[in-house]
């Protein structure tokens, strides 16, 4: 995916830029920041019909284009809070995990290029952007991260195991939710940026993706592959429209149901931090 930002440029100029990158560099998709007129024109453009277009739907607006998807930061924020055990998150997580509008695709992610990597999300409580030369003033301050007990790298086995478990949990939140999952390159092999959540100006090992294949990274990569295969295997995990919480598929049970400590009793109290979600359908 190529990320492109436009402000007041004419629509024709924007389309010419998109056409050039698609025809000359054969990119698969575009993360597009532009005005309403340009977004509508790009979604209707014949040359871009098979190009994945991702944007942010502001002010609750809904775009009904099959090739244009919503970059859903709402899922990220809720999933991060739920992952680290914040209170009063169950209801919000159930809502974002089942959200799957039929009119357009919905992109779910827990990390992106604009923020912490997954490894850093479970290794740092705060950003460490000193290398950017701006006195650590740049980058997002509210990351909803948790360092699992120690800030930064740790040789303690208990912390390493907890971080690995949390990273696996994070991948499951993304890949077992409805909608379209998006993974940040390198998250599957524990890539770290040493707590820097905005390394756009750093051209060094800090910002390069490290394709590690040893130890924890090898286990994480194998887990990611198995989880992706599991999602592909079961249609109920990637339905074309939102599940309705009743037997909409005529299978004998609700298509999605929530459970607490006892089956069929979902306890959404603010102090509860666990929930069971059952998908039920046919292949």
State the predicted function of each range.
Residues 215-254:
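Catalytic cores of secreted or luminal carbohydrate-active enzymes
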Residues 10, 14-21, 163-174, 178, ...:
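Alpha-helical packing segments of well-folded alpha/beta enzyme cores
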Residues 26, 39-185, 198-202, 241-242, ...:
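Conserved alpha/beta catalytic core and glycan-binding cleft of carbohydrate-active enzymes
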Residues 1-25, 35-47, 51-52:
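Substrate-binding/active-site clefts of carbohydrate-active enzymes
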Residues 184-189, 193:
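Short acidic/histidine-rich active-site segments
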Residues 193-225, 229:
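Extended hydrophobic/aromatic segments used for targeting, binding, or gating
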Residues 1-12, 26-35, 79-82, 149-163, ...:
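The substrate-binding groove and active-site-proximal loops of carbohydrate-active enzymes
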């Amino acid at each position: 995916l190529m990320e492109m930002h436009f402000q007041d440029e004419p629509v024709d100029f924007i389309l010419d830029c998109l056409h050039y990158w698609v025809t000359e560099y054969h990119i698969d998709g575009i993360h597009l920041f532009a005005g309403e007129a340009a977004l509508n024109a790009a979604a209707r453009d014949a040359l871009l019909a098979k190009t994945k277009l991702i944007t942010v739907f502001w002010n609750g607006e809904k775009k009904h284009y099959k090739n244009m998807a919503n970059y859903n930061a709402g899922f990220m924020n809720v999933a991060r809070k739920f992952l680290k055990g914040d209170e009063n998150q169950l209801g919000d997580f159930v809502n974002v995990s089942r959200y799957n509008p039929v009119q357009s695709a919905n992109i779910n992610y827990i990390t992106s290029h604009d923020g912490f990597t997954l490894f850093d999300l479970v290794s740092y409580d705060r950003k460490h952007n000193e290398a950017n030369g701006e006195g650590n003033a740049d980058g997002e301050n509210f990351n909803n991260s948790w360092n699992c007990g120690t800030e930064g790298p740790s040789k303690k086995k208990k912390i390493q195991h907890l971080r690995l478990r949390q990273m696996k949990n994070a991948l499951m939140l993304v890949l077992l939710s409805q909608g379209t999952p998006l993974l940040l390159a390198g998250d599957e092999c524990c890539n770290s940026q040493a707590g820097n959540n905005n390394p756009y100006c750093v051209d060094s090992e800090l910002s390069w993706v490290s394709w590690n294949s040893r130890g924890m990274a090898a286990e994480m990569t194998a887990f990611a592959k198995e989880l992706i295969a599991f999602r592909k295997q079961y249609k109920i995990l990637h339905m074309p429209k939102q599940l309705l919480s009743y037997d909409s598929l005529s299978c004998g049970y609700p298509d999605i149901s929530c459970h607490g400590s006892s089956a069929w009793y979902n306890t959404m109290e603010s102090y509860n931090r666990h929930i069971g979600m059952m998908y039920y359908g046919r292949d």
